[in-house]
């Protein structure tokens, strides 16, 4: 397996909490990413949404688009509705030769609400889960046919958060549903990244390697933050 190293712009600014790094320019982000030796970077809120603007900007700093976040509402939308909504980002990623799209379900998510307790995140019962697995499989097959693999991102505060959620998703969906393994989110959810890696290596196409401060993790779990 060939591994290429990229970085995400959240290291400079946070799209969910714009007050964190909101005054950091896109140019500073790209320049420092390149200086650090990365060859790729994920898209972010400050990035141009048109390829004729984004490609020259990335080229200026010798960077490639290595993926980027797409927040879906596939639980509530039909597959056709979600296909229509994804078109602008799909075109951008295809134009930029991105190897995949990081895809996460955000319907009902609490990730952007600091007043919600972690335990109140949305969850699906068996009936809804079955319908969702069918829809995400159809969506993934569509994106695969478009040459843009869907790399599902388990994420805190969403319906696919824990190791158990992630395993069920992968075991009950088409092989075209690939995986973004995020070590920080998996640790926060008290799961085992290495087990996921070993059990589903054939589905893993993208990875987020993160650290978590132990004291902050323990406080968050204890106080349900």
PLM region spans:
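Short, well-ordered alpha-helical microsegments
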Residues: 50-52, 166, 190
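Active-site acidic/histidine proton-transfer and metal-coordination neighborhood
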Residues: 80-181, 188
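Active-site beta-loop-alpha junctions enriched in small/polar residues
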Residues: 10-12, 44-46, 70-75, 106-108, ...
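Gly/Pro-rich active-site loop or hairpin
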Residues: 18-23, 79, 115, 163, ...
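Glycine/Thr-rich phosphate-binding loops of Rossmann-like dinucleotide-binding domains
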Residues: 51, 111, 217
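Short, hinge-like loop/turn segments at secondary-structure boundaries
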Residues: 59-61, 84-85, 119-120, 168-170, ...
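N-terminal pre-domain/capping segments
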Residues: 1-100, 138, 145, 175-178
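Non-cysteine beta-strand/loop elements that form the S-adenosyl-L-methionine
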Residues: 4-9, 66, 100-106, 201-214
